[in-house]
Amino acid sequence: FEKEAEKIKAALGETLVAVHHIGSTAIVGIYAKPVIDMLVEVRDISEVDARSREVESLGYEVMGEFGIPGRRYLRKDNREGIRTHQVHIFAADSAQVRRHLAFRDFMNAHRVEA
C-alpha cells in the first residue's frame, strides 16, 4: 500500500488531500483478497481527469466514474492480467469518503462482525 500510495501522490500532485487504505486488506485479522484498495481524497475531481496520462504511466487503467457518480476509478493488473490494485477517488470529505472510512473503521473495531 505505502509504495503505491506514494506513486499516486506524485501522479495527482497538488489536488491530492489524502490516501487511505480500505478494502479487505485494510481489515486486520481477516482473510483478504489479494487486491490493494485505496481511497483517495482530492480537492478537485476534475484535476484527476486532467492527470490521466500521469496515472496511466503507473500502469493504471482509468475507468472514469464506473457507475458511481462523483468517483474516479482506477484499476491495475499485473503482467499475468490479475488485478492487484483498485483506486477509488472522491472529492475530499464527501459522503462516499466518510462511508468507506466508517465501514473500514467499524470492521477493525468489531472483529466478530469482520
Report the location of each language-model feature.
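Conserved catalytic core of two-metal-ion nucleotidyltransferases
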Residues: Y60-A95
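Catalytic cores of NTP-dependent nucleotidyl/adenyl transfer enzymes across multiple folds
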Residues: A95-A114
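Helical scaffold of the NTase/Pol beta-like nucleotidyltransferase catalytic core
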Residues: F1-H20
